[in-house]
Design a protein with these regions (language model features):
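Conserved structured catalytic cores and adjacent interaction surfaces
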Residues: 105-109
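Positively charged, aromatic-enriched nucleic acid-contacting surfaces
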Residues: 70-87
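Flexible, glycine/charged-enriched surface loops at secondary-structure junctions
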Residues: 46-50, 125-130
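Glycine- and acidic-rich phosphate- and metal-coordinating loops
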Residues: 88-98
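Conserved small/polar residues in nucleotide/adenosyl-binding loops
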Residues: 132-134
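C-terminal regulatory domains involved in ligand/effector binding and gene-expression control
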Residues: 1-73
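Long, charge-dense
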Residues: 112-128
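A short, flexible beta-alpha/helix-coil linker loop
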Residues: 60, 97-100
């Protein structure tokens, strides 16, 4: 099982729109929501602060938000990256500063996935070994 030991940040630019991915380890839904709200305050002037998180050893809790982007173009693609990478107890917020050019639904999906992947690449991810209870 993989988890985030130390969060990180990654940035990409697509057609003049800036996508800033911030990754943080979390252990509860409340912690994830607090982190999302923290990022919304930090990037209050951004057009969108989309998010996704996975919590639990078996990914028991997973949520995502498009934060005003067209349905299924931001939060779900971000969550798909986390699930594909099998990373647990993590929250990602991707902040978008609109650059004036519409990306279309396919462009948005690719941009949010790429930003999430970049944020993860700039984080410290470890393999967590489960302990057996006897």
């Amino acid at each position: 099982m993989k988890t985030v030991y130390a969060g990180g940040e990654g940035e990409i630019v697509e057609k003049k729109s800036r996508f800033i991915a911030t990754v943080r380890p979390v252990s509860s839904e409340e912690e994830a929501v607090a982190f999302i709200n923290e990022m919304k305050k930090k990037y209050w002037d951004a057009r969108h602060n989309c998010s996704a998180f996975v919590i639990g050893d078996r990914q028991e809790i997973s949520r995502c938000s498009d934060d005003g982007e067209p349905a299924q173009t931001a939060g779900r693609p971000m969550l798909d990256v986390l699930l594909k990478e099998e990373i647990h107890n993590v929250c990602v917020v991707v902040t978008r500063y609109f650059g004036g050019t519409l990306l279309g639904t396919g462009g948005l999906v690719r941009a949010y996935q790429k930003a999430t992947q970049t944020g993860l690449e700039n984080s410290v991810i470890i393999d967590k070994i489960g302990r057996a209870h006897v």
